[in-house]
């Protein structure tokens, strides 16, 4: 597993006091090492401070800065950390605003700033020159020869590839980090001195998030703090670490002490994102020049205290407000897709089987919303409840009551007589409760629904969800089949929240009460006889495992192409204290086996809308052979 801990630091500084700044930088490095940080980024011109202005022309300051870099190289010997500090660099009688990458006693490379702000409160071109066209130069310092200098430098250790840009470089139309990322950098370091203005922090944060998303990279950002000169502007010491569009860590600005934020970067995840992205591959032709890769080697990037947050419910936003917003958007996608199918076919009726369970409830809610949107009467929604051998009073009554309060055309067809006749026809003992016993019921229900759809001139709406498709937890040509499937890319963990959203925000008290009870009912196909007290005996999660685990496994398998070992590691972190390691391993093995062996069902799926980033449609997201072996994946 390729995880690496990184940090962004803002030391206390004094303007033009190099010795003081050096001491504080060392303190930050030592603290970062204690925290197992392997890459640490300091602000722009952190050795001298950013706001020295015309003092940058003073040879004394430049000499002190050079000596401080040498001091840091000596200080770094034997320390397994790469850190980037900002300082002036004089080359061919020209001064550059530069980043120095220091590791184990050496300057690995010097990266000049490409774009110099020179308007309003900024006038860097008074002192510095742009390094935009400098690539692959070899320079030297008094204490070290053969140092790479240029904007095309990539610093690589194993699968970790690091690129550097400086402050304004991020704010231009095509930042250098775009080309560095296309060339393979998965970690971008930005040494910055971005002054604070009202709402500028929000804009800056969005820039960093968007750039890390666009580059499918991590982004370590460090900006100068409040101890810079305040003659005309104020700096806030904004520190951010982003990964592929999300913020992993961010500080509270305006701190008056040395500060470090840290985060764990998932290198494998970034690699997987790029591997699947065809446009990223195609975009590589735009790289304007050859990159110069500088190889170095971390001794050990293992993390003893792995404290990276792993979301146990990756399909469900943890923030309630965001969750509600997402729920509304999902319903809009489902209803708009279904509306298009009705408009295309010209059909005016829907047929749907209602069991009193979660999936059929969500599907019915989608159909009702669609009919309301199309201004079609709810009486044209033909809802069929089909009690069988395992139907309980609880689910039966919830199905009846829900349809009643929603105002649909409710019908009831008991499948027991037809199933008994079918058992007799095929010579299957009624008391033999095996897969045939179960599938006869599922197929009988589908046959009824299909034939009624023909009779009514309606569209049969499928109710199965993404989690069931992943596990193959459906009867082939039974509940597996429909004319249009509205839940096909909604995982079970998300189904619950969608139903809950309607119960909380869009229901009468009567309907809300029914929905809450449905949410509280154990998930079951109810294909086996109920117990002597009339309760459900066939509980899906007792048979195939907890859906929250399977949804977690599915997300990481499909989203990032994660190996079984990686999924297991992440699951044990995410569900620590919820499930024992042995339980996670058991259900992961079950998931992997079922995911492969049940592909034949997914190869024959009806149409249905893709809602999130993960779908199992054989026409789009998962083109997988039905006879692939899972042995190599266990």
Language-model-detected regions and their locations in the chain:
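ATP/NTP-dependent adenylation/nucleotidyl-transfer catalytic domains that generate, transfer
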Residues: 5, 21, 158, 215-217, ...
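Enzyme catalytic cores with a strong preference for nitrogen-chemistry domains
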Residues: 1-353, 369-378
């Amino acid at each position: 597993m390729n995880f690496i801990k990184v940090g962004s630091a803002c030391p206390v500084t004094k303007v033009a006091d190099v010795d003081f700044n050096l001491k504080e930088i060392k303190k930050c490095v030592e603290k970062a090492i204690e925290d197992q940080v392997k890459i640490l980024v300091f602000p722009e011109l952190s050795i001298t401070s950013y706001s020295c202005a015309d003092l940058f022309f003073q040879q004394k300051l430049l000499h002190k800065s050079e000596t401080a870099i040498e001091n840091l190289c000596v200080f770094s010997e034997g320390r397994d950390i790469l850190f980037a500090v900002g300082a002036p660099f004089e080359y061919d009688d020209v001064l550059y605003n530069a980043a120095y990458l220091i590791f184990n006693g050496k300057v690995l490379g010097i990266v000049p700033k490409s774009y110099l702000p020179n308007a309003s409160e900024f006038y860097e071109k008074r002192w510095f020159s742009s390094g935009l066209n400098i690539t692959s130069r070899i320079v030297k310092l008094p204490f070290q020869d053969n140092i790479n200098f240029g904007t095309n430098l990539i610093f690589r250790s194993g699968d970790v590839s690091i690129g550097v840009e400086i402050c304004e470089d991020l704010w231009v139309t095509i930042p250098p980090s775009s080309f560095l990322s296309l060339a393979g950098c998965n970690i971008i370091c930005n040494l910055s001195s971005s002054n604070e203005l009202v709402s500028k922090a929000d804009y800056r944060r969005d820039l960093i998030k968007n750039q890390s998303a666009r580059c499918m990279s991590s982004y370590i950002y460090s900006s100068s703090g409040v101890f810079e000169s305040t003659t005309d502007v104020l700096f806030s010491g904004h520190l951010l670490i982003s990964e592929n569009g999300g913020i992993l860590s961010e500080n509270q600005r305006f701190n008056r002490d040395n500060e470090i934020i840290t985060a764990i970067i998932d290198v494998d995840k970034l690699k997987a994102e790029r591997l699947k992205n065809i446009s990223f591959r195609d975009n590589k032709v735009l790289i304007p020049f050859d990159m110069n890769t500088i190889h170095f080697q971390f001794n050990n990037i293992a993390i003893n205290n792995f404290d990276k947050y792993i979301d146990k419910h990756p399909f469900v936003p943890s923030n309630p407000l965001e969750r509600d917003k997402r729920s509304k958007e999902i319903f809009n996608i489902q209803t708009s897709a279904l509306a298009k199918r009705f408009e295309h076919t010209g059909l005016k009726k829907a047929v749907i089987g209602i069991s009193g369970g979660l999936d059929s409830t969500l599907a019915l809610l989608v159909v009702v919303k669609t009919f309301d949107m199309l201004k079609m009467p709810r009486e044209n929604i033909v809802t069929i409840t089909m009690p069988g051998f395992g139907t309980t009073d609880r689910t039966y009554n919830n199905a009846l009551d829900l349809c009643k309060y929603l105002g649909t055309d409710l019908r009831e067809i008991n499948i027991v007589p037809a199933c008994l006749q079918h058992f007799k026809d095929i010579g299957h003992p009624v008391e033999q409760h095996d897969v045939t016993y179960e599938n006869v019921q599922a197929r009988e229900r589908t046959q009824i629904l299909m034939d009624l759809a023909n009779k009514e001139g309606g569209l049969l709406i499928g109710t199965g969800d993404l989690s069931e498709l992943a596990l193959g937890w459906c009867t082939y040509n039974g509940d597996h089949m429909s004319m249009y499937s509205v839940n096909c890319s909604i995982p079970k963990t998300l189904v619950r929240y969608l139903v809950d959203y309607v119960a909380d925000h869009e229901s009468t008290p009567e309907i809300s009460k029914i929905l809450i009870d449905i949410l509280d009912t154990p998930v079951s196909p109810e294909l086996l006889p109920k117990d002597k007290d009339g309760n459900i005996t066939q509980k899906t999660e007792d048979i195939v495992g907890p859906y929250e685990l399977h949804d977690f496994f599915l997300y990481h398998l499909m989203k990032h192409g994660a190996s079984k070992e990686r999924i297991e590691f992440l699951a044990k972190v995410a569900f620590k204290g919820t499930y024992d390691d042995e339980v996670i391993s058991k259900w992961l093995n079950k998931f992997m086996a079922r995911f492969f062996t049940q592909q034949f069902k997914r190869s024959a799926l009806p149409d249905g809308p893709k809602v999130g980033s993960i779908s199992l449609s054989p026409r789009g997201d998962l083109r997988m052979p039905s006879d692939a072996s899972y042995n190599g994946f266990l």
